[in-house]
């Protein structure tokens, strides 16, 4: 028994998406967001799908690609301080199951949104820009890269 230790990870951010039930909880949260938006009166179904997609992608961008560091006191000598959550995930190993899941989820949501908005031009452009804003930072070539110095410190 380890007294005084809550986990064995140096940085718990690296393994959080591999926790039991996290993928199901994530999908259920997206579904709950969609149902809450559907319950708003006088909002059409295409607008609700677009809002679901935009809110999901905005949240994903903020939490995975903007916020840096870790909320825990880690013994890693501050190595995680300058890394986003996406860069910390799975110790930086590319193409893991969690990374694939978090890459495919916005794509599936984009396809659903495009279908239910009947490929309306305005919705299509908004959803495509939103999708690109969360897919481009996930590319392995952009690991640790700060474009134009944005979010460098």
Curated annotation (Swiss-Prot):
It comes from the Eukaryota. Residues 118-121 are lumenal. The keyword Transmembrane applies. The modification Hydroxyproline is found at residue 137. It is found in: Endoplasmic reticulum membrane. Changing residue 63 to R: Impaired negative regulation of SPT complex activity in the presence of ceramides. PANTHER family: ORMDL PROTEINS. This is ORM1-like protein 3. It comes from Homo sapiens. The lineage of its organism: Eukaryota, Metazoa, Chordata, Craniata, Vertebrata.
């Amino acid at each position: 028994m380890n007294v005084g230790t809550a986990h064995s990870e140096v940085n718990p951010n690296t393994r959080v998406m591999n926790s039991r039930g996290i993928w199901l909880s994530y999908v259920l949260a997206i579904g709950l967001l969609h149902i809450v938006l559907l319950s708003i009166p006088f909002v059409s179904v295409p607008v609700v799908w677009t809002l679901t997609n935009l809110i999901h992608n905005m949240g994903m961008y903020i939490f995975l690609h903007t916020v840096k560091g870790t909320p825990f006191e880690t013994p890693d000598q501050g190595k995680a301080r300058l890394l986003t959550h996406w860069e910390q995930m799975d110790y930086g190993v590319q193409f893991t199951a969690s990374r694939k899941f978090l890459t495919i989820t916005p794509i599936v949501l984009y396809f659903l949104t495009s279908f239910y908005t009947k490929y309306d031009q305005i919705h299509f452009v908004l959803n495509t820009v939103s999708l690109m804003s969360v897919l481009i930072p996930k590319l392995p070539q952009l690991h640790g890269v700060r474009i134009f110095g944005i979010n460098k410190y």
